[in-house]
């Protein structure tokens, strides 16, 4: 997946890098999915990165996640769709053709463990350095 992004443009974009980081963290059991797990991980300062879906329909949910990230200086990145985020973090079934089915929406994901060093992780870290 990452190779496709690199080959096409020479440099990996943030969305592709985010997908790669989430996939690696999922493999290494380093993800907290959903508000309860995410809030616990953020509060214990175990989080390296937090991903929040912009189309979350619960304003208090968004406020809580943003406040915890701000309080503990944890990087927060927003994606536009919770279904897409759910697919990226493995909350779906994969059919025979390799296409995701029965995707469950996920409004918040916290990366507790990146799993391993990768170019995607470096792209994400560089993105946050530029934002500061």
Swiss-Prot record:
Major localization listed first in the record, in broad terms: cytoplasm
Positions carrying N-acetylalanine: 2
Modified residues (N6-succinyllysine): 129
Alphabetical list of Gene3D superfamilies matching this protein: 3.30.1330.30
GO cellular component, one term: nucleoplasm
Subcellular locations according to the entry: Cytoplasm; Nucleus, Nucleolus
Keyword Transport: no
Source superkingdom: Eukaryota
Biological-process GO terms, alphabetical: cytoplasmic translation; maintenance of translational fidelity; positive regulation of canonical Wnt signaling pathway; ribosomal small subunit biogenesis; translation
Main function: Part of the small subunit (SSU) processome, first precursor of the small eukaryotic ribosomal subunit. During the assembly of the SSU processome in the nucleolus, many ribosome biogenesis factors, an RNA chaperone and ribosomal proteins associate with the nascent pre-rRNA and work in concert to generate RNA folding, modifications, rearrangements and cleavage as well as targeted degradation of pre-ribosomal RNA by the RNA exosome. Subunit of the 40S ribosomal complex.
Similarity comment: Belongs to the eukaryotic ribosomal protein eS12 family.
Protein name per the record: Small ribosomal subunit protein eS12
Native source species: Homo sapiens
